[in-house]
A protein has these predicted regions:
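A structural boundary/capping signal
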Residues: 1-156
């Protein structure tokens, strides 16, 4: 995920979140895991629910969940839905991971803040089939305290 416009702390965050990329949960469960982990580490963010659409391909997905940290979007599940509804060829162009959603063909719209319920670690681990415990919380908390995350965390 080389992107010179991406702050190093978000590149590191993306690397940490690779541990749960294959968790057997959809966008609601995946963002629930990420949001809970970010809350635990003290990283300011918003868990969002809304519509994602691509006017060029007539793709529209509702409801869809994603995370926002400042101007950046975290979405590890859109590509799955694009592939299911539009095919593998179109899914290759769908955003994935952490990215700046401004100017993309896929538009994140009608988003409303959807904070996660406070769930116990063991319950999150259970619903994710053991993936939640794969997050390195020590490194995540260290990351949160090693950079001025507030520079990118002024949520829209």
């Amino acid at each position: 995920m080389a992107n010179i416009l991406m702050p190093d702390c978000l590149v590191k965050l993306n690397n940490l979140l690779q541990a749960i990329e294959n968790a057997p949960v959809e966008c609601d469960g995946h963002t629930l895991m990420i949001s809970s982990a970010l809350n635990h580490a003290g990283i300011s963010h918003q868990r969002m629910c809304g519509v994602v659409k691509n006017p060029k391909t007539y793709f529209e997905l509702y409801p869809h969940f994603w995370i926002e940290i400042g101007e950046f979007t975290l979405d590890y599940r859109l590509r799955i839905w694009v592939e299911l509804y539009s095919g593998g060829k179109l899914s290759e162009g769908a955003p994935h991971g952490i990215f700046d959603a401004r100017g993309l063909e896929y538009l994140y719209t009608s988003g409303s803040i959807c904070p996660p319920p406070a769930l116990d670690f063991n319950l999150l681990n259970l619903i994710s089939d053991g993936y939640y415990e794969k997050i390195n919380f020590t490194e995540l908390t260290t990351l949160a305290h090693s950079v001025d995350i507030s520079l990118i965390s002024d949520v829209k």
